[in-house]
């Protein structure tokens, strides 16, 4: 698949709000000439983007309103608005309450290349766990809307603040004959000391998030 123009890093997506999202920039480039599964003895956790890239998988970021065979719904509670930033990678959708925390972000990548979905999802939470002083509160490997998925919830330190995050990766696939795979990244972030006060809105966003095949 052709590389995206400028190959913008998704690590820039939440810079303005102080969070540290997964970096999928490697998937927006051409794959390595020799692909491996990286079976070295190193104990260093491998993020899902790095894992997929090592298998030669590439991805094209697709805005939510440009998806033709998939529908991804990001609900917007009262008081939440679209959060725009020129540093965002093209196609990123982010909303925020009163232009600050809490925030919700969705990134969709159209994938090219074969890989073991179950194995890939073992790497889905690594980015979150690599955040500074990350403390896991909850996790799940249950399917989401009928698709393979991994979720992790926890708190971490960033820019002098303690943040609470809910992070879900979903890997849907369209029916035959296309069998097109996507990677959907959904992240909700708020200040940890405001998580209880903002729980109604956060719960509404999480419960309203859906992934369906058209």
Name each model-derived stretch.
Residues 1-91, 178, 189-214:
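N-terminal targeting sequences that direct proteins away from the cytosol to non-cytosolic compartments
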Residues 58-68, 93-97, 140-143, 154:
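Short acidic-hydrophobic surface loop/beta-edge motif
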Residues 67-69, 101-103, 147-149:
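Extracytoplasmic
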Residues 93-119, 166:
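A short acidic-to-branched-hydrophobic micro-motif
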Residues 111-113, 156-159, 190-194:
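Solvent-exposed loop/turn segments at secondary-structure junctions
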Residues 119, 123, 201-204:
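Extracytoplasmic/secreted proteins, especially bacterial periplasmic and envelope-associated proteins
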Residues 125-177:
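Signature of long, low-cysteine stretches enriched in small and polar/charged residues
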Residues 177-184:
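Short hydrophobic/glycine-rich mini-motifs in sensory/regulatory modules
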């Amino acid at each position: 698949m052709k590389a995206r123009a400028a190959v913008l890093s998704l690590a820039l997506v939440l810079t303005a709000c102080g969070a540290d999202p997964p970096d999928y920039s490697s998937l927006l480039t051409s794959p390595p000439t020799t692909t491996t599964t990286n079976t070295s003895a190193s104990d260093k956790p491998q993020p899902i983007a790095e894992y997929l890239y090592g298998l030669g998988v590439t991805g094209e970021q697709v805005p939510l309103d440009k998806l033709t065979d998939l529908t991804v719904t990001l609900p917007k509670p009262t008081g939440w608005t679209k959060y725009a930033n020129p540093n965002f990678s093209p196609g990123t959708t982010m909303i925020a309450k009163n232009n600050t925390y809490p925030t919700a972000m969705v990134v969709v990548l159209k994938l090219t290349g074969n890989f073991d979905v179950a194995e890939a999802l073992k790497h889905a939470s690594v980015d979150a766990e690599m955040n500074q002083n990350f403390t896991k509160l909850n996790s799940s490997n249950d399917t989401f809307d009928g698709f393979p998925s991994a979720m992790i919830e926890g708190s971490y330190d960033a820019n002098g603040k303690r943040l609470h995050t809910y992070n879900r990766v979903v890997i849907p696939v369209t029916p035959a004959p296309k069998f097109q795979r996507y990677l959907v990244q959904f992240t909700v972030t708020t200040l940890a000391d405001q998580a209880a006060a903002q729980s109604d809105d956060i719960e509404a966003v999480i419960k309203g998030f859906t992934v369906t095949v058209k």
